[in-house]
Amino acid sequence: MLNGMKAPLCVIAAIIAGAVVANAAEKAAGTGVGFKGPLGLQMYSLRFHTGTNALAKIDKARELGFRAIEGGAPRGMPAPEFLKMLEQRGMKLVSTGSDYARLKNDPDSVVAQAKALGAKYVMCSWIPHEKGKFSEKNAREAAQVFDAAGEKFRNAGITFTYHCHGYEFQPHGDGTLFDLIVQETKPEFVSFEIDVFWAAQGGADPAKLIEKHGSRFKLMHVKDLRRGAAINSTGTAPDEDSVAVGEGQINWPAVLKAAQAAGVEYYFIEDEAKNAVEQIPKSLRYLESLKF
């Protein structure tokens, strides 16, 4: 202490209390003894609650406890303005998205956009196809598009990921069409984001899927599927099939244990229900309570 003086007990107590508060503030929302994260929020979760107001979305995400997001700048808003809004709130954008057409026809513009946003990851969540008829041809064409775009991302220091959406888990040979996409893409160019809800809704076992493809999975959408929900290959489901994490049919200890063993780098809660802002706190509490 200054001048060799002993600090009064009240000062020591204050220092200890301050350290406890600081440590609590540093702990990411939703993490705990078992699940370590890091955990962010997919901003699509807030579409029913804040409309098109970008500032309201960011503030709601922060209010819910998140400091990292997956999303993008609103249409018409310059990336620097959006990033400033995040920075002022102690937040950051980790991952952003692109539609398939842009990846195929103008991947350079997607790279430029991702760099402007400071995104470490870019994900694509849909391959165009006739509803309910995703085919081997669709899968092989997508693999070529992903490899070509993925090389550009790799050269820019960005990781490209394809986000599964349920329709890819139709049988094909000894596996599925999702397996085909994995096999037909180069690991150095293409990684994957497992959406646990859509993997299960498409008929896959999410934990076994992660164990099968291991380090190809870099990101995860932490999202639960209602017990009794229909399983199909359409890639569509009612909003109410998205329930709070821990209240649905997913075996989360098995999934998250497999994900941590595989080296998944970032997790994002996504909740598609109309009452997502009520469900997300429940999801966070469940994740904090997990031990495995």
PLM feature spans:
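Hydrophobic faces of well-ordered beta-strands that scaffold small-molecule active sites
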Residues: 37-42, 69-71, 93-98, 122-124, ...
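Active-site beta-loop-alpha junctions enriched in small/polar residues
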Residues: 44-46, 72-74, 98-101, 127-129, ...
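N-terminal pre-domain/capping segments
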Residues: 23-121, 215, 285, 289-292
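Bacterial N-terminal signal peptides
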Residues: 10-19
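Active-site acidic/histidine proton-transfer and metal-coordination neighborhood
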Residues: 26, 59, 67-68, 75, ...
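Acidic/histidine-rich catalytic cores of soluble enzymes
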Residues: 155-249
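Aromatic-rich peripheral "rim/lid" segments of glycoside hydrolase catalytic domains that contact
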Residues: 242-244, 258, 262, 273-292
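Bacterial N-terminal signal peptides that target proteins for export
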Residues: 1-11
